[in-house]
């Protein structure tokens, strides 16, 4: 029986693809070598230890229906669209070796006519007249008996959108967590006009088979053709949850300030695991009572725009005469934390 396994996803759902990756990694025999090929529709994927409010323009992502997905590996934030090809190599130890998977990708690119080289810890670059340009970034995860290397290849990604979503608003965040390093990037279509996802997948597959001297049939997976993966439903539920994608952010503080016609407001939040652990308000409003009441309501709550807005509007019962102020405050807070 072959020790290789080849899976190709026809789903563009990042939560589905990352859940499949997680299940296969957890349950694969330690003797197996796996190649998983996939791609995501509009998504910002962040590293396991990153803060989405710090890394991403979360407001613009929500407006443009761009998903957030936290992966289980470390590293920085990346924007995925259908112009990216994603790959994952998995193997048991001691055979797991990220230099092997890197060489497979480099061999695939070479077969397509692109001369690339490894750079730093996790990038592949090509040399251009303007200098080195990144075409691939990777991240890694290891456990006691296995490891994986996953990454992306830029085929025809919309690089302008990359800048839109990975440049966060200038919020006053004093945050822990890993900050992404921005690199100069280029698309493979600049070097190979017309290159497709299918061609790149075929080249990586051939290089994978050539390295191990074996061939296997591809398993095509989708939400309708999920392979036999125990606990997949639970893994997908976790991967797609707010608690995982946002709530796992490292502790941070957020300062919001605004001046309204009725006074200036400064709100200080301390947030841990997506929950507000401390809320303070400072204001020169002639009627600060609603704001003081708000901080008490927010303590311990989720740091989510809809929840903050809900708590603001709940104060209308106790402070009906301040309806105008509370509605203005509600709209502002909801927009400021997205």
From Swiss-Prot:
Protein residues bound to (R)-lipoate: 134
Gene Ontology process terms (BP): protein modification process
Catalytic reaction list: L-lysyl-[lipoyl-carrier protein] + (R)-lipoate + ATP = N(6)-[(R)-lipoyl]-L-lysyl-[lipoyl-carrier protein] + AMP + diphosphate + H(+)
Domain of life: Bacteria
Keywords: ATP-binding, Cytoplasm, Ligase, Nucleotide-binding
GO molecular function, one term: ATP binding
Domain named BPL/LPL catalytic: residues: 29-216
Compartmental location: Cytoplasm
PROSITE patterns tied to this protein: BPL_LPL_CATALYTIC (PS51733)
Gene Ontology CC annotations of this record: cytosol
A Pfam family assignment: Lip_prot_lig_C
Broad class of the protein's primary localization: cytoplasm
Positions bound to ATP: 71, 76-79, 134
Pathway membership, UniProt: Protein modification; protein lipoylation via exogenous pathway; protein N(6)-(lipoyl)lysine from lipoate: step 1/2; Protein modification; protein lipoylation via exogenous pathway; protein N(6)-(lipoyl)lysine from lipoate: step 2/2
Family, per entry: Belongs to the LplA family.
Record text on subunit structure and interactions: Monomer.
Protein purpose: Catalyzes both the ATP-dependent activation of exogenously supplied lipoate to lipoyl-AMP and the transfer of the activated lipoyl onto the lipoyl domains of lipoate-dependent enzymes.
Miscellaneous notes: In the transfer reaction, the free carboxyl group of lipoic acid is attached via an amide linkage to the epsilon-amino group of a specific lysine residue of lipoyl domains of lipoate-dependent enzymes.
Name by which UniProt lists this protein: Lipoate-protein ligase A
Organism encoding this protein: Escherichia coli (strain 55989 / EAEC)
């Amino acid at each position: 029986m072959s020790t290789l396994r080849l899976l190709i996803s026809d789903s563009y759902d990042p939560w589905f693809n990352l859940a499949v990756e997680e299940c296969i990694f957890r349950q694969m025999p330690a003797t197996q070598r796996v190649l998983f090929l996939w791609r995501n529709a509009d998504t910002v994927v962040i590293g396991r230890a990153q803060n989405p409010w710090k890394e991403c323009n979360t407001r613009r992502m929500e407006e443009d229906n761009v998903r957030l997905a936290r992966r289980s590996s470390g590293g920085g934030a990346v924007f995925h669209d259908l112009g990216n090809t994603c790959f994952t190599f998995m193997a048991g130890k001691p055979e797991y070796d990220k230099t092997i998977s890197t060489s497979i990708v480099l061999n695939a690119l070479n077969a397509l006519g692109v001369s690339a080289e490894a750079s730093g810890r996790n990038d592949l670059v090509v040399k251009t007249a303007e200098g080195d340009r990144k075409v691939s970034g990777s991240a890694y995860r290891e456990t006691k008996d296995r490891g994986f290397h996953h990454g992306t290849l830029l085929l025809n990604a919309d690089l302008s959108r990359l800048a839109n979503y990975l440049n966060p608003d200038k919020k006053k965040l004093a945050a822990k967590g890993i900050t992404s390093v921005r690199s100069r990037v280029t698309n493979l279509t600049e070097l190979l006009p017309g290159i497709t996802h299918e061609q790149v997948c075929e080249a990586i597959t051939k290089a994978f088979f050539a390295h191990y001297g074996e061939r296997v049939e591809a398993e095509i997976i989708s939400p309708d053709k999920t392979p036999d993966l125990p606990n997949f439903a639970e893994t997908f539920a976790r991967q797609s949850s707010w608690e995982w994608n946002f709530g796992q952010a490292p502790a941070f503080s957020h300062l919001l300030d605004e001046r309204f016609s009725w006074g200036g407001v400064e709100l200080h939040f301390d947030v841990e695991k997506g929950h507000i652990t401390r809320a303070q308000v400072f204001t020169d409003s002639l009627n600060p009572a609603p704001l003081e009441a708000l901080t008490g309501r927010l303590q311990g709550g989720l740091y989510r725009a809809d929840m903050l807005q809900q708590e603001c509007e709940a104060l209308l019962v106790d402070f009906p005469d301040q309806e105008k102020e509370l509605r203005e405050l509600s709209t502002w807070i909801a927009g400021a934390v997205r």
